[in-house]
Amino acid sequence: MKPHAGVSEKSNHNFIGSPSDDSLVTREIEVSIRETAAGYMLFEPDAIYIKKGTTVRFVITNTGAMSHEFYLGSFDEIQQHEQWMRSHPDMAHVDQNAVAIPAGETAELVWKFSVETNLEFVCLIDGHREAGMWGVIIVHD
């Protein structure tokens, strides 16, 4: 797979926060990825509430049989990036707001949430979002 920077390199992440140093983590959130016999692909939990100013370490474990990704962004950014991925399905993410998680593995993403906003996390591998791989993050005061 060829790497690409996609939307996030072109965007200013200030409105959703920013990557952060592991030593500044104030909260850890475990997220699991699973696939069901009925064909659904899910993040658990699929709704996360975070206080503004919190630096979070997401620990994402893929318990499924397929590779997945955890992509964090605004609803608009994700929609744009989803279109990009449909045109370039073999591109690997190098975005600071995304991690790829092969089957049976765990990955981490450290992010500081600096403004009140609503965000989405999603797997943008073709067909995965449609199979249920998305969730929301509500950043509150």
Mark where each language-model region is.
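Short aromatic-acidic-glycine turn motif
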Residues: 76-87
